[in-house]
């Protein structure tokens, strides 16, 4: 009897996402969910009153899974860690509660979820750095401060792209994201545009292209905020995670 070749039986199994990556994936899911609700709420859109229910239920389940991933890390208790878990529990509750409401209120209940999930990701990364040296390998593509800021804004659901008269434009909310930066991220496989997936900029206007992180973008950003802070030459500083205190340039 001929032994079948084993080459075709060998394959790489992707490792499970880290807690930080899982929270970033959760933020992306909330962005997609909110965009879907925005499209349903467009003037003249005809949809079932509970069209959002299945998606909201999946988000509540995904949030509870993220909470378990965080608690499974067995980090030492701290006020910051406790606050992060509470925020995630609140997200799970709001997602679940949104199923009992019609679209306008349901959209309101998850409006801030992407930013909250990203804030939790940053907090967990900080706790892991503080409690033990990170084992995260440095990504092949080292992020510049500008790229890191742009990836953070994208992950929070703050960046969309449009076209007008043959030109491309990027619209952002907190930190500035230039079209050149977006193109660089796309060229490196870290970000992508989803055509006509985000709400219009004005009533009756065309849908915009949502900019989202790719799997590689999530991995690189998670690694960037998870690595221990090391000494740097004078005059160089790490790029801080953007905060909501920056003046908004684009309304929700």
Where are these regions (language model features)?
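Short alpha-helical segments that sit at the start of domains
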Residues: 125-157
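C-terminal amphipathic alpha-helix
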Residues: 12-37, 105-136
């Amino acid at each position: 009897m001929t032994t079948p070749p084993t080459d075709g039986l060998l394959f790489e199994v992707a490792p499970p996402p880290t807690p930080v990556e899982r929270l970033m994936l959760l933020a992306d899911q909330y962005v997609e969910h909110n965009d879907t609700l925005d499209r349903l709420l467009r003037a003249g859109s005809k949809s079932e009153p509970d069209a959002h229910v299945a998606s909201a239920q999946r988000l509540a389940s995904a949030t509870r899974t993220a909470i378990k991933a965080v608690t499974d890390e067995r980090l030492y208790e701290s006020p910051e860690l406790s606050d992060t878990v509470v925020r995630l529990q609140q997200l799970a509750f709001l997602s679940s509660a949104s199923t009992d409401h019609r679209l306008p209120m349901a959209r309101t209940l998850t409006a801030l979820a992407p930013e909250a999930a990203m804030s939790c990701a940053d907090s967990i990364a900080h706790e892991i750095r503080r409690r033990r040296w990170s084992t995260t390998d440095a990504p092949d593509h080292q992020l510049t401060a500008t790229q890191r800021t742009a990836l953070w804004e994208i992950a929070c659901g703050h960046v969309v792209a449009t076209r007008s008269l043959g030109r491309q434009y990027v619209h952002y909310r907190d930190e500035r994201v230039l079209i050149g930066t977006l193109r660089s991220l796309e060229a490196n496989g870290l970000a992508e545009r989803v055509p006509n997936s985000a709400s219009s900029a004005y009533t009756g206007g065309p849908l915009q292209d949502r900019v989202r992180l790719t799997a590689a973008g999530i991995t690189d950003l998670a690694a960037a905020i998870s690595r221990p802070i090391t000494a740097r030459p004078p005059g160089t500083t790490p790029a801080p995670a953007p905060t909501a205190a920056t003046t908004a340039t684009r309304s929700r």
